[in-house]
């Protein structure tokens, strides 16, 4: 017979019973303590129920708690009713069994045989694994296929105890849950329910003793809402991307505590790679521009060459440094944060070399630094000349042309170098390509008053687009024609319809080499007055000859730059000129070698007018009288195929009548009235 208190205890629920600890239980506790010594790392993982062996008189089960609760004298049926157990904090009071089993009502597929309870004479129901409490580790499977290969030492040591044997073959399929990775290596905080959305958290620095391969390789750019990903160990040298995982002997520069200095250190370690990449980049850029930018390109060239990204974009294998498709958009934001940090340290982004990247960095994206400077350098024309000349005169350059902007007069570009007009011509390299913009003697002298009485040809920042093959020219009759299809009759009819203009002729009497390299000097006899005019033009500049069409001193170079078929200009050729009809019967002629549609600026002398689509910066850029406020013609855009308006409609629309026009034409000038004409470039008429 059992004592009365034992029988009364059986009628009570398990939680209400008094559970005295007998000497037998104490003995078993002592023996079990010698068999299993819990470690501090395993304390969070060994919470559960310890099932004790049974004696001849009945089953005795000790619940691991604070040592204050125990169940004695339970029958097998009563024992099977136990399903919820207490959670021990850090110590155990097992009853001498060789194994410790976590218990919980899980599906039957997780049940284990009762052979864990070593008693051959009694049949016991199956023992269940205990469900992990809310404070313990939880794993979730990725809702998408992970592109990351997780190494065996993926989890920090506070999360897995040495006694927990989790198959390493399953590890690549798990990712740490959000709250398990804390800012410091503290006990695991409360984890959210697995039903919650997948969140990312900051990384924790794991103890160095348990993770020898990853103890010093935490990601550098971590913020709330980001999840660190541990990659396979990299076998690359230290000069590559910063987020790679190195071997056990990794350099300490990659520790999170030195994240800021790691950027500089990694840049220093990759010096050889950068030098190799700088040479590769310099082949793609113009020599002058790349030399000026080389110091700023060094840190970033390492990023862009061969598709590498200096921000350490995350990929399945760190050895492949090109950005990969990511499962979540948050990782793209991580890259932006790192790139932003680099930009704040005065790193220059040259993503424009990558044409296929829409780049959120922008790395953005895709513009060169000097290109942006060229667009905004109207206040500094000298800098614009220096930066844009390579785009203009070297078609093989990969840089895009910029819009035309007015340039200072009397400046020379020789082989990409800006040369003042006072420079001795003998100092300029022979064969250097110099383009000229039309300039008045007065303006040239005002620019360099003390240097030279007769200024040299002035610079041009781009090729005139209206000479490009396919450019559309609008005649005075309203008809549109391509520049290569123009004929002599088109000029004649346009001058007749215009009213204020008349066709004149300019005969070539001599062609000489100019004192300025890259130019030729042409001598003309113009109009009825047989005025002698000398101009200096590039040899590729086209002229329109009666009955022949476009001609130039160098047809091959004209075809190369403009794709415009030309004949060779020779002595005796008669070029088309347009004369402005004078109201007082004094003809002020304007010799022309270009079709209608000339660009004009209102700053030049009042008596000047223009014929043809000549460019402002090219030697044929001529201007309408500023006093009259008229402009002979103007192409819409300085680009190939752009439409250029013929001078006549604009002239009629803006020209002034009566005494105002008469006064403007009789205004005194430095050149005599009867020889006031200009075909293109600088004119020596009347000197």
From Swiss-Prot:
Stretches assigned to the AXH domain: 455-586
GO terms of molecular function: DNA binding; POZ domain binding; RNA binding
Chain spans, region Interaction with NCOR2 and ATXN1: 20-197
Modified-residue entries (Phosphothreonine), positions: 328
This protein's record includes keyword Acetylation: no
Family matches, as SUPFAM superfamilies: AXH domain
Tissue specificity remark: Expressed in the cortex and hypothalamus (at protein level). Expressed in neuronal cells. Highly expressed in Purkinje cells of cerebellum.
Basic and acidic residues: compositionally biased ranges: 1-19, 272-283
Stretches for region Self-association: 20-197
Biased composition (Polar residues): 28-43, 198-219
Phosphoserine PTM positions: 282, 359
Disruption phenotype: Mice with conditional knockouts of either ATXN1-ATXN1L or CIC in the developing forebrain exhibit intellectual disability, hyperactivity, social-behavioral deficits and reduced thickness of upper cortical layers.
Region (Disordered), start-end ranges: 1-46, 185-223, 261-294, 356-379, 587-649
GO cellular component: dendrite; nucleolus; nucleoplasm
Superkingdom of this protein's organism: Eukaryota
Keyword terms of this UniProt record: Cell projection, DNA-binding, Nucleus, Phosphoprotein, Repressor, Transcription, Transcription regulation
Subcellular location: Nucleus; Cell projection, Dendrite
InterPro entries associated with the record: Ataxin-1_N, ATAXIN1-like, Ataxin_AXH_dom, Ataxin_AXH_dom_sf
Additional note from the record: Its overexpression suppresses the ataxia caused by polyglutamine-expanded Atxn1. Competes with mutant Atxn1 and wild-type Atxn1 for association with CIC. Decreased association of mutant Atxn1 into its CIC-containing complexes decreases the levels of mutant Atxn1-containing CIC complexes, suppressing pathology, while promoting aggregation and thus increasing nuclear inclusions.
Quaternary structure (record): Homodimer. Interacts (via AXH domain) with NCOR2. Interacts with ATXN1 and CIC. Directly interacts with RBPJ; this interaction is disrupted in the presence of Notch intracellular domain. Competes with ATXN1 for RBPJ-binding. Found in a complex with CIC and ATXN1.
Reported function: Chromatin-binding factor that repress Notch signaling in the absence of Notch intracellular domain by acting as a CBF1 corepressor. Binds to the HEY promoter and might assist, along with NCOR2, RBPJ-mediated repression. Can suppress the cytotoxicity of ATXN1 in spinocerebellar ataxia type 1 (SCA1). In concert with CIC and ATXN1, involved in brain development.
Protein name: Ataxin-1-like
UniProt source species: Mus musculus
Gene name per UniProt: Atxn1l
